[in-house]
Amino acid sequence: MSEKYIVTWDMLQIHTRKLANRLVKKIHSWNGIIAVSRGGLVPSALLARELGLRCVDTVCIESYNYDCLKENRKIIKKAEGNGEKIIVIDDLVDTGGTAKIIRKLYPKACFVTIFAKPMGRSLVDNYIIDIPQNVWIEQPWDMSISYIPPLIQNYKIK
């Protein structure tokens, strides 16, 4: 995947608020949130704030190793229950591998993501941004802001 979609902290918050706006209409339906670790951790905090929910748990599924999608996903930890009155959130649905596990673990949950790629899109109940399948998403927690020297410093003035 050579093309990248860069997500800033501001854009993540804007997109998560859009998602919250869709979910707030059913606010009496929700008892809590399950964040899919690690991608859903930051969005879950933002979503919990916007919806006034205090109960946030995690399901930990190893899907990626840095920038490489793993074939065999491993459930490290799961939240209890079948997902009734729960929002499960991840940052992205990609090929659908993790989403299929989430659907089996929490069949009654409302599963949402910020970003959705074509192969996994049908597995989520709601999402905000369409992303082409061949595009890699760079999330703000995976990047750092660093100083870039001016170009002139590459040239010695004699």
Curated annotation (Swiss-Prot):
Short name of any one Pfam family annotated for the protein: Pribosyltran
Top-rank EC class of the record's enzyme: transferase
Binding residue positions for 5-phospho-alpha-D-ribose 1-diphosphate: 38-39, 90-98
Cofactor(s) needed for function: Mg(2+)
PROSITE patterns per UniProt: PUR_PYR_PR_TRANSFER
EC number of the protein: 2.4.2.-, 2.4.2.22
Keyword ATP-binding recorded: no
GO cellular component terms, semicolon-separated: cytosol; plasma membrane
Signal peptide: none
InterPro entries for this protein: PRibTrfase_dom, PRTase-like, Xanthine_Guanine_PRibTrfase
Bilayer topology: Peripheral membrane protein
GO molecular-function terms, A-Z: guanine phosphoribosyltransferase activity; hypoxanthine phosphoribosyltransferase activity; magnesium ion binding; xanthine phosphoribosyltransferase activity
Subcellular location per the Swiss-Prot or TrEMBL entry: Cell inner membrane
Residues that coordinate or bind guanine: 94, 137
Alphabetic keyword roster: Cell inner membrane, Cell membrane, Glycosyltransferase, Magnesium, Membrane, Metal-binding, Purine salvage, Transferase
Function statement: Purine salvage pathway enzyme that catalyzes the transfer of the ribosyl-5-phosphate group from 5-phospho-alpha-D-ribose 1-diphosphate (PRPP) to the N9 position of the 6-oxopurines guanine and xanthine to form the corresponding ribonucleotides GMP (guanosine 5'-monophosphate) and XMP (xanthosine 5'-monophosphate), with the release of PPi. To a lesser extent, also acts on hypoxanthine.
Subunit structure, interactors included: Homotetramer.
Protein name: Xanthine-guanine phosphoribosyltransferase
Organism this protein belongs to: Buchnera aphidicola subsp. Acyrthosiphon pisum (strain APS) (Acyrthosiphon pisum symbiotic bacterium)
Phylogenetic lineage: Bacteria, Pseudomonadati, Pseudomonadota, Gammaproteobacteria, Enterobacterales
Name of encoding gene: gpt
